[in-house]
Regions:
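Bacterial N-terminal signal peptides that target proteins for export
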Residues: 1-10
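C-terminal motif of bacterial Sec signal peptides marking the signal peptidase cleavage site
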Residues: 19-22
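Bacterial signal peptide processing site
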Residues: 24-26
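A cross-family detector of function-defining hotspots
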Residues: 31, 63-103, 129-175, 181
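N-terminal low-complexity, Pro/Thr/Ser-rich intrinsically disordered segments
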Residues: 31-62
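Short, recurring structural edge motifs at helix starts
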Residues: 51-57, 116-121, 156
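Glycine-centered tight-turn and secondary-structure capping sites
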Residues: 61, 120, 124-127
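Short, low-complexity, Pro/Ser/Thr/Gly-rich segments in the mature regions of secreted, periplasmic
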Residues: 182-194
Length: 194
């Protein structure tokens, strides 16, 4: 009887340990996966990429207060409520060179001015205009830059899931100097909130 009890207890311990291990593996995937409860689409900062809908957990259309409460963006106490920029919170894991345009409390655009952020298709600062054309093909429209002689705005409208949103690459004529993603019309505002 004592031996049966010991064997049963040992089997229960092994079963509980197996379940605990399986649950913790699933939790990692739930948090890191695109459909996870926190909406994280990337496992590391190195593969954080911009698309028409946002950058990681910072989503176009999101309330600024929500992004601040999640520790993604800093508050701006002197913010112009009509239109202003905010920057990533320290420790948020967002690379330098990223800012978010906020209009009436909503994130409407994310700008990348420097750094290592790429689009989900791999486009980045320093790419040639030809590379942008090769990535986006007929989806890219090219217009003359209003502030840089010889420069261009290369705009890629979002697909049906991202209707009303776009990516905009600014070039000095040959290379991407900066790019952004967001909703129309704000993503096409040439001078930001000015």
């Amino acid at each position: 009887m004592n031996r049966q009890r010991t064997t049963g207890l040992l089997a229960t311990i092994v079963l509980l340990a197996s379940l605990g291990s399986a649950c913790s593996k699933g939790d990692d995937k739930a948090v890191k996966g695109r459909n996870g409860p926190n909406g994280a689409a990337h496992d590391t900062v190195s593969d954080l990429s911009l698309n028409e809908d946002g950058l990681g957990q910072i989503q176009i259309g999101m309330n600024l207060d929500d992004a601040v409460n999640m520790g993604l963006l800093n508050e701006n106490p002197t913010m112009n409520k009509q239109c202003d920029y905010v920057f990533p919170a320290v420790g948020a894991g967002i690379p330098e060179g990223v800012s978010a345009m906020v209009v009436r409390g909503k994130i409407v655009r994310i700008d990348v001015d420097t750094g290592t952020v790429t689009t989900e298709d791999g486009a980045k600062i320093g790419d040639t205009e030809d590379r942008i054309k090769s990535i986006y093909g007929n989806d890219v429209t090219i217009e003359p830059h209003t502030l840089i002689d010889g420069g261009h705005y290369m705009t890629v409208l979002g697909d049906s899931a991202s209707a009303g949103k776009a990516l905009v690459f600014e070039t000095e004529g040959q290379h991407v100097a900066r790019f952004r993603a967001g909703r129309l019309p704000e993503v096409k505002w040439v001078s930001g909130c000015s």
